[in-house]
Amino acid sequence: MLSKALFFSSLPLWAKVASAAFGITTTDSSYTIDAGSPNPLKFTVSRSSCDITSINYYGSELQYQSKGSHIGSGLGSASVSAVQNGDYIKVTCDTDTLTHYFVVHSGDPIIHMATYITAEPSIGELRFIARLNSNLLPNEEPFGDVSTTAGGSAIEGSDVFLVNGQTRSKFYSSQRFIDDQRHCISGSAHRVCMILNQYESSSGGPFHRDINSNNGGDYNSLYWYMNSGHVQTESYRMGLHGPYSMYFSRSGTPGTNIDTSFFANLDIKGYVPASGRGTVTGKASGADSNFKWVVHWYNDAAQYWTYTASDGSFTSPAMKPGTYTMAYYQGEYRVAETSVTVSAGSSTTKNISGSVKTGTTIFKIGDWDGQPTGFLNADKQLRMHPSDSRMSSWGPVTYTVGSSSVGSFPMALFKSVNSPVTIKFTATSAQTGAATLRIGTTLSFAGGRPQATINSYTGPTPSAPTNLNSRGVTRGAYRGLGEVYDVSIPAGTIVAGTNTITINVISGSSGDDFLSPNFVSAYPFLTLMRC
């Protein structure tokens, strides 16, 4: 009985493998693509809308049946065609301002994609969303259920929820672009991963982050956000976005090094092959070696980045020709920039050097890394709402230099929650001359910015920062334009002995609780320097 049971249970698997046949099946309404892969993958694309309406992998239907997978919220209508050329199938979806491609290589359980645009979509963001069966694919990777909102009650807008006493949001699935080469959703028998080979036409730079996944109950969403208005810090880029790849597997997590160079032979709009690109090599120096160093290249058409080696040496990704701003970061804090010109088929050598420049420091809170790392609740803010019961109390806080820990200083100040923050420090008689209080921030909301009072002296009201028109801290963001505020302190203001600084959030706007005007602390938040 055992051997008979084993034989019959293996027969469907054998049949599935044997039936895999690479090709296109065409009907009046759709194209069905068979990848010809050992673990069979078939998917169906609507000929009228470009929606994926079915994804059958290893005998299971993974596509959510009530709504398709698509660009944006769906193209609505498009001119859709499909061609097979040897070992490759290409589906092309055309609108007036957008062309989307699905590409399959014979034998691979992968849907490769690329999206070419000449204008930003009317919804104000460019994304691909795969709406997949949440019963078969309930899990989100790598951050788990922080973005599983199924069964929750909305507590902020329509995108932050309370689920079993924990705050959750699709925004809490985000990862910095420089670290996000793969994100996945999975179940006991299937895994689907988005593999990101190319961010060159996206926006925001290496430290930008956006939504990656969201199990909302009816379906589990796997995204690639190419651009959006979510803490948007630079203009959108046109041209070809991608290639990017949706990889299907049974249990293993695929690697991120996927060769898509075959796109060069498939007549893909805007695709620049390796032969049409160049690189930049060099050495970075001068920044604090306690932090990772990043080199970043950007212009209106493209962006690239890389971590340096431990000795500062670097080689850029293959870049499109052009002249680029070249920036150098200590952590996420920019310490230098220059320009460099890249030519096709050649490597350009360009070194870069820079460091944090300060005067004689009386005290500082935190490190010059462009992040709120180490401050109160910074270890939780990426993955939960500030109101979450797992957060430590936001204060108001009194911080005493020399005895308080950096971890007791709030990573963000909210006008209606924990403003002001009070700092006490002791000065010697030699430190009572003119000084500068430098307050570094990474992100502002609703015009929130710091105004400082040192003993009886109140510094000037700073101008309002650029309005990014996007919720930040409550949706797991901390990086915006990075305003730094210097407050000149007249001689005699600081006294020998105990001194008190209070920093208030000021703004012409108002709001409740964590949606009141606020800013994120970093750089460090505060350095007191002798002039």
Swiss-Prot record:
State the reactions this protein catalyses.
Endotype eliminative cleavage of L-alpha-rhamnopyranosyl-(1->4)-alpha-D-galactopyranosyluronic acid bonds of rhamnogalacturonan I domains in ramified hairy regions of pectin leaving L-rhamnopyranose at the reducing end and 4-deoxy-4,5-unsaturated D-galactopyranosyluronic acid at the non-reducing end
Write the record's keywords in alphabetical order, separated by commas. Carbohydrate metabolism, Cell wall biogenesis/degradation, Disulfide bond, Glycoprotein, Lyase, Polysaccharide degradation, Secreted, Signal
For whether the record's keyword set contains Chaperone, the answer is: no
**GO terms assigned for molecular function:** carbohydrate binding; rhamnogalacturonan endolyase activity
Q: Where in the cell is it found?
A: Secreted
Q: Which InterPro entries match?
A: Carb-bd-like_fold, Gal_mutarotase_sf_dom, Galactose-bd-like_sf, GH-type_carb-bd, RG-lyase_II, RG-lyase_III, Rhamnogalacturonase_B, RhgB_N
State the CDD domains in the record: RGL4_C, RGL4_M, RGL4_N
Q: Which residues form the signal peptide?
A: 1-20
The cysteines covalently paired via disulfide bonds are 50-93, 184-193
> What domain of life is recorded for the organism?
Eukaryota
Name the glycosylated positions.
Answer: 351
State a GO cellular component annotated for this protein: extracellular region
One GO biological process term: pectin catabolic process
Is-annotated flag, keyword Plastid? Answer: no
In short, the EC number is 4.2.2.23
Stretches of the chain forming a coiled coil according to its record? none
Family, per the entry?
Answer: Belongs to the polysaccharide lyase 4 family.
Which purpose does this protein serve, as stated in its record? Pectinolytic enzymes consist of four classes of enzymes: pectin lyase, polygalacturonase, pectin methylesterase and rhamnogalacturonase. Degrades the rhamnogalacturonan I (RG-I) backbone of pectin.
Put simply, this protein is called: Probable rhamnogalacturonate lyase A
Organism whose genome encodes this protein: Aspergillus terreus (strain NIH 2624 / FGSC A1156)
The gene is: rglA
